[in-house]
Amino acid sequence: MAKQTRRVLFKISGEALSKDSSNRIDEMRLSRLVSELRAVRNNDIEIALVIGGGNILRGLAEQKELQINRVSADQMGMLATLINGMAVADALKAEDIPCLLTSTLSCPQLADLYTPQKSIEALDQGKILICTTGAGSPYLTTDTGAALRACELNVDVLIKATMHVDGVYDKDPRLFPDAVKYDFVSYKDFLSNQLGVMDASAISLCMDSHIPIRVFSFLQHSLEKALFDPTIGTLVSEDVNHVCSPRH
């Protein structure tokens, strides 16, 4: 039986905002994201959004190229997510879609400091919650930050939109043409087989809180379709029958 969905967290790659490997935020891609968030919200779904910063800067890559320490590199990556979040927030406001921009780092001139209580209030009020700066600590990925937010906000499902693959595979399909895609994989099998796409800490957090994850290609499908169509991407869960349905 389909589970009635009330609250969802979307994890979006920063690359979804840029075009042709550019670090420039693309107007059309930003407009598409806003349009798709509106479509999901029109189903009476509460939305939290965690956005990456890889289109602007990747912490580990910058650490190697610029010879800066890991902590500084990761903090630079966190700030990149804030830049993307500011762009999304302004684009939503321009369309009269209420939102709250939050940061785990204190920067009151730019965003509200993230707290679960304030964030849940915003969701209850119908605002789209934008969570930036990842987990707020170095050495932790934005995927882990998204999983933390999903647990704190008690979401019904975490949807990860990727730009490179259309689900979870037994090995990297970009390197191995014979890679096999999973329609469903349990949390434990994901961890024991060391599958890619999301890091183990993010999977473990969702497993402990019984939050299903759907991984799909943002290049191929919409957020709304990924949320409600069980044939899209890969479901990572303890229950193969977990299907989301709109609220009525």
UniProtKB/Swiss-Prot annotation:
Activity control summary: Inhibited by UTP.
GO molecular function, one term: ATP binding
Residues reported to bind UMP: 53, 74, 135-142
InterPro entries recorded: AceGlu_kinase-like_sf, Asp/Glu/Uridylate_kinase, Uridylate_kinase, Uridylate_kinase_bac
Keyword entries, A-Z: ATP-binding, Cytoplasm, Kinase, Nucleotide-binding, Pyrimidine biosynthesis, Transferase
First-tier enzyme category under EC: transferase
Catalysed reactions, semicolon-separated: UMP + ATP = UDP + ADP
UniProt cross-references to NCBIfam families, sorted A to Z: pyrH_bact (TIGR02075)
Family: Belongs to the UMP kinase family.
Protein name stated in the entry: Uridylate kinase
Source organism per UniProt: Chlamydia pneumoniae
